[in-house]
Amino acid sequence: MLKRRPVEVLFTFNANASRMAISSITLAELLHGAEKSSRVSENLAAIEDFYSRLEVLPYGTKAAQHDGAIRAALEKLGQPIGVNEMHIAAHARSEGLVLVTNNIGEFARVPAL
């Protein structure tokens, strides 16, 4: 979304922004990336424009419970995923939401996501 491509995805986002949300974990990842970039102010402004049109969902107890269950299940299978990916997956699953991502490899391992 932030890179505004592909154009088809941007149109879909703009048409459906009122029905979309972002995890506070995802927002933290985006802000971290902006702060490390060579164009901090420009990237922070783009991120603010992006998330200002979305509901930012706080990570709470329900998400933490899903996180523990997902982590244990994936460890038993010997297929752990990254810490932030774990938090994001747990958050989406705990809210019964559809997760939109380019990182299919890790998120596809999460049961019932």
Sequence positions of predicted segments:
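Short catalytic/metal-binding and nucleic-acid-binding patches
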Residues: 19-22, 26, 33-36, 54-62
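Flexible glycine-rich beta->alpha loop in the catalytic core of nucleotide-sugar glycosyltransferases
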Residues: 7, 98, 105
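Active-site neighborhoods of divalent-metal-dependent phosphate/nucleic-acid chemistry enzymes
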Residues: 45, 54-102
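Short, solvent-exposed loop/turn segments at secondary-structure junctions
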Residues: 27-29, 63-64, 105-106
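Short, well-structured N-terminal submotif of metal-dependent ribonuclease cores
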Residues: 1-22, 32-49, 76
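A beta-strand edge to alpha-helix "cap/lid" segment located at domain peripheries
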Residues: 81, 106-109
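Nucleotide phosphate-binding site architecture
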Residues: 2-3, 28-31, 57, 108
